[in-house]
Amino acid sequence: MQIKIIKLKEKAIIPKYEHDNDSGLDLVSTETVEIPSGESKLVKTGISIELPPNTEAQIRPRSGLALKHQITVLNTPGTIDEGYRGEIGVILINHGKRSFKVTEGMRIAQMVIAPVIRVKIQEVEQLSDTIRGQGGFGSTGV
């Protein structure tokens, strides 16, 4: 399976897998952005992609940024639809107590390509019964 990628900026870095068995391609910032404590910012990657049919790209946090700096992706996972052709941006949020500086060339998130199953919607009067029923939000214990 292939993804077509355009570099929209000269300094953009094409995403790559850091290791052969990784599921996420590293996305890299093309700009320097300061994210104050408790705030979020859109960080640009300088690339645009064309996904294969029936796939999506999921934007996920990097565990090292989350653990060491409390930086994560705000709308996790962010979804890039198959038809989107604009620049990929990542909404990062700073949950830390100090301001955090994203620098040009920093790996800021992971992009995982996943299959999409499109369904037909059927409106019904009633759903089938299950053992769980309507139990949710802690109904099976903490």
From Swiss-Prot:
Question: Binding of substrate: at which residues?
Answer: R62, S63, G64, N75, T79, I80, D81
* MF-aspect GO terms: dUTP diphosphatase activity; magnesium ion binding
GO BP: dUMP biosynthetic process; dUTP catabolic process
Query: Which keywords accompany this UniProt record?
Result: Hydrolase, Magnesium, Metal-binding, Nucleotide metabolism
What are its cofactors? Mg(2+)
Query: RNA-binding as a keyword?
Result: no
Fetch the InterPro entries from UniProt. dUTPase (IPR008181), dUTPase-like (IPR029054), dUTPase-like_sf (IPR036157), dUTPase_trimeric (IPR033704)
Q: What is its EC number?
A: 3.6.1.23
What does the record give as the reaction this protein catalyses?
dUTP + H2O = dUMP + diphosphate + H(+)
**Does the keyword field hold Metal-binding?**
yes
List the pathway annotation.
Pyrimidine metabolism; dUMP biosynthesis; dUMP from dCTP (dUTP route): step 2/2
Which top-level enzyme class is recorded in the Swiss-Prot or TrEMBL entry? hydrolase
Q: Which Pfam family is one of those matched by this entry? A: dUTPase
Explain the purpose of this protein.
This enzyme is involved in nucleotide metabolism: it produces dUMP, the immediate precursor of thymidine nucleotides and it decreases the intracellular concentration of dUTP so that uracil cannot be incorporated into DNA.
Q: Into which family does the record put it? A: Belongs to the dUTPase family.
Report the NCBIfam families cross-referenced here. dut (TIGR00576), PRK00601.1 (NF001862)
Q: What is this protein called?
A: Deoxyuridine 5'-triphosphate nucleotidohydrolase
User: What is the gene name?
Assistant: dut
